[in-house]
Amino acid sequence: DFASLYPNIMLSYNISPETMLCDCCKYYPKVVVPQLGYHICSSHIGLLPEVLRPILFRRFCYKARSKNKKYDKALYKEMQQAWKWVLLVCFGYTGYRNARYGRIECYESITAFSRDILLTAAETVEAAGYSVLHGIIDSLWVKPNKTGCISPVHLSRMISERTGIRMDIEGRYRWIVFL
């Protein structure tokens, strides 16, 4: 599971309504959206990344505390879930047609980067001797093809390094059904 994939994409690629298709980077873009060809400003940080950075940091802190016995696990689990929804709403708002501060190119760019990241992760998985069973939005289910494959922890680190987005192992299953 990629950790807060869409908000991390907005931060990593500076996606914000005022940074999409800017005039200052039109002819020499440093960041181009895969499959779409949109360019993103690299001269200044957008409002969305600026606002999302502290929220995302707070969510990760609360999530870590929700797994630590020294803290009230239930309280921090609820708090990190609340911040998760705030972050998801920020993504959804970028694609809302009547949004005062939205732009469909932001929404399209976030999902394009997400597809690209998922495909890169799948390539990494297969190169490491695993098979991809299923992948959707921000998650991959994989299984080793043979014994002697690298550990799942090492695999998640490789994917994180290659994509620039942290991947966490959410579980291990003896069997699974996809409907």
Mark where each language-model region is:
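Conserved acidic
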Residues: F2-L179
